[in-house]
Amino acid sequence: MMKMKRRKAYGLPYMGSKNRIAEWVVGALPANDTLVDLFAGGCAVTHCAMLSGKFNRVIANDISDAPEVFADAVNGNIDLSGFPLTRDEFKESTDTLSRLVYSFGNDQRYYIYSSEREDVCIAAERMMYGATVADRYAAYKVFIRALSSHLQCGDNLDRKVSRLQAIEAVARLQDIHGACPEAELETSRCDYRDFDAPAGSTVYADPPYNGTRISQYGGGFDYDAFEDWLAEVDFPVFVSEYTCPRGCVEIASRGSLSLADHSNSTRVVEGLFVQERFYDSVMAGDRDAE
């Protein structure tokens, strides 16, 4: 059984993150020398696995560069020199870190602050990012003027300004560096079909869930092709899904909340599945580990 200090958050602030169930996923995966996180995304499972003591090496693969951003966070190489970002700067930015931190719901598409409170929030952030006391004091004066202007107009910004989500995201990134992971991290950027998994490794796959849309895959993920791939490979793949992939069987499940959009959530059953032809060997391995 995995024993580790419970964390508040794992991985990058990332839309679709497995942060809330990362410990459950890692606890259900068989211990091994190497774990491959095939659709790593925001690297919540990667991060949790690195801290779990179950693996000596974790390979985070994705078609995006998010695992590279996570690796930078692990190594303390996060560059905040361009922060904070205004709405116009966000629109022009192609930097993954900036677009994650300054997007609503970390979707990299929509700017995090509404137009009505952008001036106040950006001024508040500049008070924190200022390199010198003079810089921070100048930002403080701008913040006070902006806040006073809103209050004079009768705007109620107390609740909206009390949380600077971008600052919270940066604090989360910096906390990753302070976690002292036990496992070695490697990153890869390729399609899951092109990844060459090390022999004998534990392979975990968290593809976009069947029926969902995701921008990294041109608006849609070819789930039939993924199921065909599962049928062809000569190693077990542990798949997170709400529904059982073709040719697979369930090895674990739990209820969780799914955010259907940025405001509503529904209760769903999250399952962990493996190809049926590997089920007996996987379960035998679990019994041997007990």
Predicted regions span which residues?
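Short, glycine/charged-enriched secondary-structure capping and boundary segments
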Residues: 51-54, 73-76, 217-220, 252-254
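A conditional alpha-helix N-cap/helix-loop micro-motif detector
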Residues: 14-18, 90, 219
